[in-house]
Structure formats: C-alpha cells, structure tokens
A protein has these predicted regions:
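Bacterial N-terminal signal peptides that target proteins for export
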Residues: 1-6
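C-terminal motif of bacterial Sec signal peptides marking the signal peptidase cleavage site
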Residues: 14-17
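Acidic/histidine-rich, surface-exposed loop or edge segments in extracytoplasmic proteins
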Residues: 22-37, 99-101, 174, 227, ...
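Soluble metallo-hydrolase cores and metallopeptidase-like ectodomains found primarily
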Residues: 43-97, 124
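Active-site/substrate-binding loop(s) of hydrolase catalytic cores
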Residues: 91-100, 108-267, 273-276
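Hard-cation-handling environments
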Residues: 261-444, 448-449
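Feature captures C-terminal
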Residues: 372-526, 531-534
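Accessory, solvent-exposed terminal regions and/or long lumenal/extracellular loops of proteins
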Residues: 492-494, 500-591
Length: 591
C-alpha cells in the first residue's frame, strides 16, 4: 500500500506537465457522453489520446505505418519514464503489454475501453502503480480504413454502438487471417512492430456472436494443444488464466473460455475449446513463446457492459503481469531457449490438435433457460432464451487434446533464392537465415507433389490449396548461390515450419504461394511417335529401364497396346526432362 501511494504521487508529478491539475470533466470520452450509444471516429479517437499526451510526459503517440487509403496506423506508447523503445523499457525491468483494438473495426469495444483505461490512470491516478512494472502499447484502431466506413447496418445483430465500421479492410481482407501470409499493408506494418517490441502479453479485442449465455466476455489463450512451449503453457494456465478468471469474477464480470459445444446450442452435451493456428492473433503470439489473449465480448450484451468488462480485463492482466513479472520473463527466456535447442526437435511438432474424450472436468456454465418452439414465420425449430431465467448448468469440459497431424522438424530449411516474396516474409517474421555465397552440394529431404486439391471458392483473394499429396525422399542436390539457409536453432524456427511445411494449416502452400510447383503448368512439347526413336535409345543406354520394360511386356494387354508401350517411354522422358516441376522449393536438412 505504501509503495502504491508513493508511486501514485511520483507519477502525478511526472505526468502532469501543465501548471494546474486537469479538470476531470474535460476528459469524459465521447462514448461516455452518449451513454455508450456512440463510438468516436478515428480522428476523434486520436484527438482524445493526443489530449492525454498533452498533459502527460508518459504518453507518446507515433505511427507504425500507413493504410491503403493513406491513414496513419497510430500507436500510443505509455511508459512511466516516457521511454519509447523496448530495449530502454526492459532495462528498467518493466514488461510490455500490447493492446490491439478494431482489427475487426465493427467490434470497437477495445478502442473505447483503452481510452477510458488510460484516462483513469493518467487523469484520475487509478492503478497508476501498474506503470512501475508494466508499459503499454495501444493500437486504438488497427483496421483504420474499415473503421471509417461507418454505418448503422454493418453489424445489425450487435447490441451497440449505433454506428460502427466494417470487419474487412478497404482491400476486403480479414486481418485476423493474415498473421502468416501478410497480404495486407496494415499487417506487414504490424509484423514489424510486433517483432521489434515482442510484448510479453498481446491482447486482441473482438466481439462474437453464436451461442447465448450470461457471460459478457469470453476469451481464448492458445494453451490447450502444444503450440505454446510447455513451460510457458503451464505458466499461462496456472498463473495467468487462473488469476484472470478469479479477478474478473471478483469485479462482477465472470468470464468463460471461447468454446463450442458437442451439440448445437447445448452446452450440457460437452464443451470443446477450439485450437487455432498462427494465422490468428493469439496463436501467432503463442508460436513466438509469448502470451496472447483473445477477448471475445458477447454481441448481445449492452455496449456499456462490454466496454467496462474490457477495462477490467486490461487491469487484471496488467496486475497479474506486474505481480509475476520475474517468473514470466524467466519462463519466456527458457521457452525461447528450449524451442531453439536440438532437444526440442527430438519429437515431432504437432500441427493439428483434436479434443479426445478420455479426460474432462465438470464446470459451472452460466446460461439461460431455453425452449424450442415451431416458428410461425419459417416453420423451423426456433430456440429461444429466457433472459428472465438465468440458470447454472453442470457441463463436461473436455481437457485432453492430442496431435492428429505432426511433422518432424529438420535441422535447417534450404529455400531457393528465386522465391523472393517468401524470403520477404521471413524478414517480416524475424526468422533468421544466412545465404550461400557459392553453389553447394547438399543431401536434403525433398517433397515432390503428386496431387493437389484446390478450393472452388476464393478466400482472402486467394484460391486455397485444401490438400496436397507428395512423396518424400532423400536427394543429393546442388543448392545455388543465394539460397537461403534457415537454421532451426532459433526461437522462430517453429514459425518457419508453419510457413513452409505443406501440411501446416494456414501455411504458404495453403495460401497459394507455391502453386507453380504444387500443380505445374509446364507443357511437355514432345509427341508420342517420337518415342519410337527415343525408346530404342533408352533401352540401349539403361539396363534397369530395359529390365523394367521387359517385365511389363510379360503383360499380354500391355504388349498388344502400342500406345501404352510408347507412353511408357514418354513418361520416363517427361519425368527426366521436368524433374523439378513438382519439387517443393524448401528443402529439409535432416540430422
């Protein structure tokens, strides 16, 4: 208590740069003035943050990029000493929390919560002692172009505010599918920011629809599978997630995991916690060995409740990190060291996880009484919730998850130098690599594609590759000068695998970066009759092929089919002529 009082007085002296203490009435947000009916536009939002910066040396505003429509991607840095670099802040022994709002700009809860949370610290001195141990980065509006596409019809089933932005960007991209492929200029700027600051905690604020329940807020932390390193996964469960639930319940906003049910609209049938891959925000943090919290506020709850609950989640998270920062920093360092070690690669890395029935726990789930009636409008069964009758259900929560798809990590990847767009992504994701200065012969494991299944619909402006089939073999190949060598003895080695492995969900193969080799379009301009000459030549030169041909000729049907005979040689020549057409350009150096 004494430390908190002293910290508050010191910060008050530091943060107020004008002669008189600001009038608190001047810092009521536009959202509060409207009784949480309205949310401000981008210009008004940043003007408010600038107003706080004008009276506090702890608040700095900068830009980390520009949107396609030319708007600033604004970043608000809050540090007790006014520091503006991660190195300087960490030298002071503080941890960093990145709070991102409006990645889907029709979901503005985090933006208004950030304004009020920071105002309460700077102007009202509430929880000001948090700044002794924590510095904050706020992105008030990530999808800034979508945010300015204001309309009352963008999310008609959402309970406020009355006008808001759109889910997608001006380029019609969903930023929360873009963390790996980074098609959007906004995301490319964000990746540079994130990989420079590497915040200990990243909070991404959303609003969800779907199931109906009493909770104002649900959440996700990708710690059910093995995406998060085991030591950090345990820390996130035993300390962060446990205390977050306790603290939110104490302030009147109990929370629950972002979940689905075994049967539609029936939590009592079993609650399943979905796992995600690093194309999504909280999972991108997890694969970096950092905490990622996805907040999914409930779309049917009043906007005021959602904003106030979000503020409490910010405070609770910051308090947990402030009180446990030494153990968190140590755990993260150990996680980075572990995933960069040869020991980590002794076991396959899971890519897909699925819940299994062998373990579950009974939990209380705050729901509503419901009944099913025959709709007089559509004739369908209509499930209706009775908001006058809150109920607590005892439900099984599945706690066991097993990997259903895995890959053995190599010692290194070798990527051919002509794949410049992929190499650019390695830089954006801060994946370290070296380049060969001259050609080098190496024994590598390769993938050769034999079949690909493409989506019949576009996604994010791309045609996803839903499934690939390929052979795996060891080959001795000459790697050309300029080839990129990605040593897996680095914390971001796992991220390289998520990008380059064909079977990884959300990989660059999935998004079509390698379509030229997944399904080669090169034509083989040799006519079948030429095989009359070439076949004889091959039989003279290649004893193994001659033996194979003679074995085939024992089949009477084959021996009588002149086209099949010529095609036998045709396929042999085609395979030799275009032996690299279906070769995946990321080769694997195995132990």
């Amino acid at each position: 208590m004494k430390k908190s009082w002293l910290s508050g007085m010191l910060c008050l002296l530091m943060c107020i740069s004008c002669t008189n203490v600001p009038n608190p009435e001047e810092y009521i947000t536009d959202c509060e003035k409207s009784d949480f009916v309205k949310t401000p536009r981008f210009e008004e939002t940043m003007a408010y943050f600038q107003k706080l910066a004008d009276v506090s040396s702890m608040v700095k505003i900068t830009s980390f990029g520009t949107s396609p429509e030319g708007r600033d991607l604004s970043l608000v840095i809050v540090d007790k000493d006014g520091l503006q670099s991660p190195e300087a802040i960490r030298q002071k022994g503080r941890v960093i929390i990145l709070i991102e709002s409006c990645i889907h700009s029709g979901e503005p809860d985090g933006k208004d919560a950030s304004m009020m949370f920071l105002r309460d610290m700077i102007i009202h001195q509430k929880d000001i002692d948090l700044l002794d141990d924590v510095s904050f980065l706020f992105i008030p509006v990530f999808n800034v172009d979508g945010h300015e596409n204001f309309s009352a019809t963008n999310r008609i089933n959402q309970n406020g505010p009355e006008e808001l932005g759109t889910r997608n960007t001006a380029q019609q991209l969903n930023l929360n599918r873009d963390f790996l492929k980074a098609d959007a200029p906004e995301m490319r700027a964000w990746l540079k920011l994130y990989n420079r600051w590497m915040p200990e905690l990243f909070i991404d604020v959303h609003v969800t629809n779907g199931a109906d329940f009493q909770y104002v807020m649900t959440y996700a932390i990708d710690n059910r599978g093995t995406l998060m390193e085991e030591g950090l996964r345990k820390w996130s469960l035993d300390i962060y997630e446990k205390q977050l639930n306790e603290r939110m319940t104490e302030v009147g906003f109990p929370i629950f995991l972002y979940a689905s049910f075994r049967k539609y609209n029936a939590p009592e049938s079993g609650i399943i916690i979905d796992t995600f891959d690093p194309r999504y925000s909280e999972s991108y943090a997890a694969v970096h060995n950092r905490l990622g919290l996805l907040i999914e506020n409930h779309i049917y709850k009043p906007y005021k409740q959602r904003v106030l609950a979000t503020i409490e989640a910010f405070k609770a998270s910051a308090r947990i990190l402030a009180e446990n920062k030494e153990s968190l920093v140590k755990t993260i360092a150990q996680a980075d060291q572990h995933v960069a070690s040869p020991e980590y690669r002794t076991k396959p890395m899971d890519l897909v996880f699925a819940p299994v029935n062998k373990d579950s726990v009974w939990v209380d789930y705050l729901s509503w009484a419901r009944d099913t009636v025959k709709s007089d409008l559509s004739g369908a069964d209509w499930v209706r919730h009775n908001y006058e009758k809150p109920i607590t259900l005892r439900c099984p929560l599945i706690t066991s998850y097993e990997g259903t798809l895995s890959v053995q990590l190599p010692e290194a990847y070798v990527l051919m130098p002509q794949w410049d767009k992929v190499i650019d992504l390695l830089d954006l994701h801060n994946i370290r690599y070296s380049r060969l200065t001259e050609p080098k012969e190496m024994t590598v494991q390769t993938y050769r594609y034999t079949k690909a299944t493409f989506s019949t619909r576009q996604s994010e402006g791309r045609i996803p590759v839903l499934k690939t089939e390929y052979t795996t073999q060891m080959e001795t190949r000459t790697c050309p000068a300029g080839s990129v060598v990605i040593d897996m003895n680095q914390p971001n080695g796992r991220l390289a695998a998520w990008l380059l492995e064909p079977s990884a969900p959300g990989s660059l193969v999935y998004w079509g970066f390698f379509n030229q080799v997944v399904q080669s379009t090169n034509e083989f301009w040799i006519r079948l009759p030429y095989m009359e000459e070439k076949g004889r030549e091959l039989l003279k030169k290649d004893p193994a092929l001659k033996a194979e041909f003679e074995e085939r000729m024992k089949d009477p049907a084959f021996a009588k089919d002149s086209q099949a005979i010529l095609n036998f040689f045709y396929q042999k020549v085609k395979k030799t002529a275009h032996q690299n057409n279906e070769l995946h350009p990321a080769w694997r150096v195995m132990k």
